[in-house]
Swiss-Prot record:
A GO molecular function held by the record: 3-deoxy-manno-octulosonate cytidylyltransferase activity
Superkingdom of source: Bacteria
Recorded metabolic or biological pathway in which this protein acts: Nucleotide-sugar biosynthesis; CMP-3-deoxy-D-manno-octulosonate biosynthesis; CMP-3-deoxy-D-manno-octulosonate from 3-deoxy-D-manno-octulosonate and CTP: step 1/1; Bacterial outer membrane biogenesis; lipopolysaccharide biosynthesis
GO cellular component terms, A-Z: cytosol
Protein name: 3-deoxy-manno-octulosonate cytidylyltransferase
Keyword Nucleotidyltransferase among record annotations: yes
GO biological process: CMP-keto-3-deoxy-D-manno-octulosonic acid biosynthetic process; lipopolysaccharide biosynthetic process
Organism name: Ectopseudomonas mendocina (strain ymp) (Pseudomonas mendocina)
Family the entry assigns: Belongs to the KdsB family.
């Protein structure tokens, strides 16, 4: 039997690039509802939306989601999850899956996958997923987060910059992907144990996290191992910009 887990969907209203992002309409539903519906198709025992805004609370109540109002001053979605774990009274070994509130096309299969990967890799404090990068434009796009892992599938680092830097190949051209380099895009879905979430908050942000604006770097900086596997099913990219929103609307026939 697979381990039980809870999905938490952080949904923040004040997005820098797309204000009110969780409530943006896609095919007649707010974006956060699409994410919630996908999460409900997974094996999660519970799906909770966590937000800092009363407008999102009210929207979630309309479509029947369990929703918690959290503080507004969290540094990251993971900090928000720690508050949710406390509000829900989750034990330290409970598995919590963070499904980003801007991933309306997240496949339920990878929600189950990342939870199972954490359960079967006790050496890791976090589990997450990736997929191959096959487009050189994506490699140089700072909105596409890159990840490099060791031979055991444990992350070495994450960056918005190309990883690794193919010195000789890029000296000749940056228009094609270098042959033989396994570039991977990080997929922003995470599984944690509830006890880890409280450690994460206690550490506070580090300079590397603040520089890259990547919260998972706080864990690596503090010596926590992150398990990375290739996703069973590659999701479409999430919604960061107005252009992304229009792309998803087209995909869903809005």
């Amino acid at each position: 039997m697979s381990a039980a887990f809870t999905v938490v969907i952080p949904a923040r209203y004040a997005s820098t690039r797309l204000p009110g992002k969780p409530l943006q309409d896609i095919a007649g539903k707010p974006m956060v509802q699409h994410v919630w519906e996908q999460a409900k198709k997974s094996s999660a025992s519970r799906v909770v939306v966590a937000t800092d805004d009363a407008r999102i609370v009210e929207a979630c109540k309309v479509f029947g989601a369990e929703v918690l109002l959290t503080r507004e001053d969290h540094n990251s979605g993971t900090d928000r999850l720690a508050e949710v774990a406390t509000q829900l009274g989750l034990p330290a070994d409970a598995i919590v899956v963070n499904v980003q509130g801007d991933e309306p096309l997240v496949p339920p299969s990878i929600i189950d996958q990342v939870a199972a990967n954490l359960a079967t890799n006790p050496q890791a404090g976090i589990a997450t997923l990736a997929e191959p990068i096959e487009d050189v434009t994506a490699l140089f796009n700072p909105n596409v987060v890159k990840v490099v892992a060791d031979k055991s599938g444990l992350a070495l680092t994450f960056s918005r910059a190309p990883l690794a830097w193919a010195r000789d190949a890029f000296a000749k051209s940056r228009d094609v992907l270098p042959a033989g380099v396994p570039y991977r895009r990080h997929i922003g879905i995470y599984a944690y144990r509830a006890g880890f979430l409280h450690d994460f908050v206690a550490w506070g942000p580090c300079w590397l996290e603040d520089t890259e604006c990547l919260e998972q770097l706080r864990a690596l900086y503090n010596g926590v191992r992150i398990h990375v596997a290739d996703a069973l099913e590659a999701p479409a990219a999430g919604v960061d910009t107005a252009e992304d929103l229009e792309r998803v609307r087209r995909l869903l026939g809005a």
